Amino acid sequence: VEQQLKTKGKKKEELPELDTLGELLTGFQVGRLKYSEALESYVRSKFSVEIQGNYIMILAYLGDHYEEERKRTIPALTALLKDTISKKCQILDFLVFKSCLFIFPCEGEEAVLVKRFQKTILTRICNDSMASFGWIRFTGLSQLAESAATLQGCMDWCIPLGNGVIIHYPRIKQLQTSPLSYPVDIENQMKTAICMANPTKLQETFRDFQSYFRKGALYDPKKIKESYLRFI
């Protein structure tokens, strides 16, 4: 019995001291925390949070504008999310991908939450920001890091779809794309403009090149990136 009590005491001592819910989420994000029944009980008692519950993650990709958008757009976005989607929304920095993550319990129908985000937040933010957004539902905070990586791998879809559309996983995997033919004629026009040293023509031709991928057909973002690399 004495040995059992010592073992239980040890287990309690091994539990991390978590002062905020943000610390809990960061712990799972960076791999510092692992699921255990003891941790689950501790978190439920301290934060009234279910580690094994269903959660929504919104990824806000800021890219090269990270520093500026982090200060300017993210505070307003956080307030909007708490007002219209979930008061339990927490924010994490995802520096390796120049992004921020918003995480909250999935309370209610996911389809309703997505629609609300699209109508009340995305349209407003996109008018004044260059951020693009991804959305994923996951079960268990131990899946937080993997879910962020999954969204990261999908964000190239913003290239053909634009920032006004949320990249919703796994729906995004169901999109059908059209074959992409490289615009050789536009490339030849660009070569001519370079030879003529005509900056106006250069700008016009590059705009034509950009417009080529937005003429109604949906192309694989990887193919578009390959075309840009070839063109440049």
Protein language model features and the residues they cover:
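Interdomain helical linkers/hinges and coiled-coil/dimerization scaffolds
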Residues: 1-113, 135-159, 163-197, 207-211, ...
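Extended Gly/Ser/Thr-rich low-complexity repeat segments
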Residues: 111-119, 123-126
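Conserved short beta-strand edge segments in small beta-sheet-based binding/regulatory domains
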Residues: 123-139
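Helix-capping and short linker residues that terminate individual alpha-solenoid repeat units
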Residues: 214-215
